[in-house]
Amino acid sequence: MTGYQTKITRIRAQLASEGAAGALLSTPDNIFYATGFSSVMDGWHLVEPIAAVFVPTATASPVVLILPEASVISPIVSERGGHPVHFDRLATFDMLNFCETARAEDAHLALPDDLLAELGDVMEQVEGQCEPDIVQSIAACLSRHVSKEEQILFDDLRVAARVEALTRQASGDALDVMFAARAVKTADELDTLRESGQVADAIMSYTISQLGVGKSWGEVEKQVAHFMINHDVDPLPGSPMLFGGAYDLVFRPDLFRTPVS
């Protein structure tokens, strides 16, 4: 059994003990835990979810990853980078002008044939139609796999409230289930903790060595960033780099919420 299968099995066992029909996870940490999927937009700390995963209690039902239609290629890119994304089926939703931009033809980009073939395979795993937003995509996904009387546990109760208002889906809190499932680490997680822990210790030791009277924290940060880069550790999340840096007081990604006329 792979690390991914072990995680899903643990989640399902906890769901069964609670008498729930499944879990709908829409927070980045839980999505990554259950599928290995992460989005560059996670670093923007948007107030709305940008992906979700439905983990049914029944082993015969599929684990469904819900993501923007424009991000369907993401699992392929991630796997090619050595980070496979695990799911049984996909469901999609629109994301305003983010999807409009992604659908536009790029005159300077020609996708290789093998990538197009893989994309075709992934598209065959998409169920249902592309919904207008993530809440409607979640609601449609649940309606395909469970009845509205069966309880679904959510890790974001705002999402639960919206879905319940839309379809009267019975809902509950997934907090205890996910804590219990994640408390016991898989072999892969333990290996990662051992490896990353040594690197983190080295970075902290170097940081302490750079502290001194008269030094600004900005100077220390620059030195530590160089040390991290030299040890193959990315000192910045990828998302701010898309726009030249983390301009927290200037840039907000509201352009992705603006309707396209």
Residue ranges and their predicted role:
Residues 203-206, 210, 234, 245:
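Amphipathic, soluble alpha-helical interaction motifs
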Residues 197-208, 217-225:
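Active-site pocket-lining segments that scaffold enzyme catalytic pockets across diverse folds
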Residues 146, 211, 260-261:
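Hydrophobic beta-strand core residues of beta-sandwich domains
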Residues 34-44, 157-161, 165, 172-184, ...:
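Short catalytic-site patches enriched in acidic/histidine residues
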Residues 1-199:
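A composition/biophysics-driven feature that prefers long, compositionally simple stretches
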Residues 183, 191, 205, 213-214:
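Glycine- and small hydrophobic-enriched segments that form the cores of compact globular domains
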Residues 15, 211, 228:
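Hydrophobic pocket-lining residues that define ligand/cofactor binding sites across diverse proteins
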Residues 61-62, 69-70, 209-214, 218:
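Electropositive, surface-exposed helix/loop patches at the edges of structured domains
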